Structures are given as C-alpha cells and as structure tokens.
Amino acid sequence: MSPEYFLRSLLLIILATFSANASNWLYLAKLSSVGSISEEETCEKLKGLIQRQVQMCKRNLEVMDSVRRGAQLAIEECQYQFRNRRWNCSTLDTLPVFGKVVTQGTREAAFVYAISSAGVAFAVTRACSSGELDKCGCDRTVQGGSPQGFQWSGCSDNIAYGVAFSQSFVDVRERSKGASSNRALMNLHNNEAGRKAILNNMRVECKCHGVSGSCEFKTCWKAMPPFRKVGNVLKEKFDGATEVEQSEIGSTKVLVPKNSQFKPHTDEDLVYLDSSPDFCDHDLKNGVLGTSGRQCNKTSKAIDGCELMCCGRGFHTDEVEVVERCSCKFHWCCSVKCKPCHRVVEIHTCR
C-alpha cells in the first residue's frame, strides 16, 4: 500500500467519523413532524441518523415523533439556560446542529449530551403516560399501599421505559465503538447524568378523596419533574463540571479528575476533557456566532454584563419605545381592560 493511498484512506475514515457525530440525531428537531412515518423506508431519509439508529427507527416507528420532541425540548432548554451566556446554544441548519462546539470535549458539549439524552427519556416517558404508544403505558409496578399511608393509584410515569429507550437510541454510537476512547467515555457519562437528572427528581403527586373536600384517604402516583427543573439541575452541574482524563483500573478504561486534589465525580456530575474557547468572535466554521450584536446588561457584573458579554469591545446604547399594558381594571363579568402605556428604554448591544 502506497503512503498516498494510506493517507487518503485515513482521511476518508476521519471524515466519515465526523459526519457520524453522535449528536447528529438532534437534527430531527429541525423537522416539523415525523409523526407521518409509517413505513420503514422513511427512516432511511431522516437526516443525521447513523445506521444503527436507522434500524431502531424501523423497529420503533411510533416512537420517532417522541424522539423529535425530545430533541426540540433539549434545544429549547439549552437556549433558555444559556440565554445570558456568550455561547447561547444557537443552532445551525447544518450537521451537527450546534456546529463543531459539540465535537470537542468541552463543558458545552457535556451539557448538550446530557440535556439531549434527558430530552429523549422525558418525551418518550410522557408519550407512554399519555397513551400515545402501544409498546408502553403507565408504570404498573407502582401499586398497593405505601408505608406513608396512602394508596398508589393513577398513572405513574413509566420512566424506566423512557430511560431504556434513551440509552438504546442516544448511546448507540459510543456503544458501537466499544466505548474505549476518552471522548466516548465522556459522552456516555454525560448521557447518563442527563437521565439521572430526571430519575433523581421524580415526584410523588397525590389527590385527596373524602366528603366535602376532606382528605380521608389519598391516592398518589409518581411523576417526572418539569423539564425546566431538569435543565436547572444540569445547568448547576455544568457550572461545577469536572475536568477529567483517561486512566486504567486493571484492564478497564475510566475517567478520573485531571487534578488529583479534586474529589471524584459522581454519576450525576458532568465531566469534560478540553477547555472551552472564549466564544467572543464569530467563527462559523466551528459553530461560534460570537457576541457582536448580543444584548447585554449594563449594570451587571456577571457574565450577562456588557463588560464580560462584549469581551471588552464596548457596546452601543439605543433608546427604543415600548408599549406596555397599564392601568388595568377588572370589569364584571369577566374581563380585564388595560390602557396602552408608552415607555422609552435603553437597549445595550455588544460591538
């Protein structure tokens, strides 16, 4: 084999690996709906899936719209949590949807993997509970009386099914590679941390029964937390994420803190391998839109403040007129009427 042929072959392998980035399935969020998938051949046309995900799609046609909703949930929550950060989870119309930000082993990639695996688990579980799927329903293992004195009843969220489907669908690329590279280990860890954010925050919801509103006895069921709660938990984990490196315990490859003085991470924590860029400058090649034109808070000293958000470049101040509702009065029955009030406010945007 000639050196030139070897190099060309190696380049093709690298490009193929990149094109099959493990988060490419998030492109499903760009589709208006995949609920119309009724034939296996349609799965082949879904952009962003690797072959094993295509096979899962063919075996689980009815679940794919839940996967799409999970991807949308993940992107929307990411954009909410990072709305005041330099990197605000902006998406592109290409693969991967977050650009090369998620192909690097950064904190941001850790959060994306965690929130997206949680999104699929959440959306599939919700579809089970609402009766949308034939393959699953409510969690029937939660039955009978409880030590607290209430009766398990109602429709408990079948989180076990949602988590299992998320593991099978989202983790498939890393699993197919044998999960031996440090990046595969990082992705798998953060995927599981995302699902743990749901599992560890399951709630007990109850309904009282009795005469005249009394609570003679209660029936209760287990419910997932709101997805905003999941996002809040993972955002805290992002802020406290642990930088790790690969090590070996016997023949097993594991991730350990890069700084031995730091306490070991748990299954619930996010981990990362590489330092993040500053996200200040426009770099579309890497999916970084920069902060020029972003609104900032003139009085804040935090990351949303103009000094930090604008990376020291300064900012523009414009006055704009906004119309708000004021002098609202309740009219019997049953409406609220308000007057329009005009107010001039200052808007600060990064140079």
From Swiss-Prot:
Q: One Pfam match, by short name?
A: wnt
Q: How is it modified after translation?
A: Palmitoleoylation is required for efficient binding to frizzled receptors. Depalmitoleoylation leads to Wnt signaling pathway inhibition.
* A single cellular component GO annotation: cytoplasm
Gene Ontology molecular function, alphabetical:
cytokine activity; frizzled binding
Stretches assigned to coiled coil: none
Q: Provide the protein's localization.
A: Secreted, Extracellular space, Extracellular matrix
**Which sites does the entry annotate for glycosylation?**
21, 88, 297
- The intrachain disulfides are 78-89, 128-136, 138-155, 206-220, 208-215, 280-311, 296-306, 310-350, 326-341, 328-338, 333-334
Q: Does the keyword Zinc-finger apply?
A: no
Record keywords: Developmental protein, Disulfide bond, Extracellular matrix, Glycoprotein, Lipoprotein, Secreted, Signal, Wnt signaling pathway
Where is the secretion signal located? 1-22
**Where does the entry say this protein is expressed, by tissue?**
Predominantly expressed in the diencephalon neuromere D2.
Name one process (GO BP) from the record: positive regulation of skeletal muscle cell proliferation
Main localization, broad class: secreted
- Chain residues carrying a lipid of type O-palmitoleoyl serine: 212
InterPro entries documented for this protein: Wnt, Wnt4, Wnt_C, Wnt_CS
What family is it from?
Belongs to the Wnt family.
Q: How does it assemble?
A: Interacts with CPZ.
Q: So what does this one do?
A: Ligand for members of the frizzled family of seven transmembrane receptors. Plays an important role in embryonic development.
Q: What is the designated name of this protein?
A: Protein Wnt-4
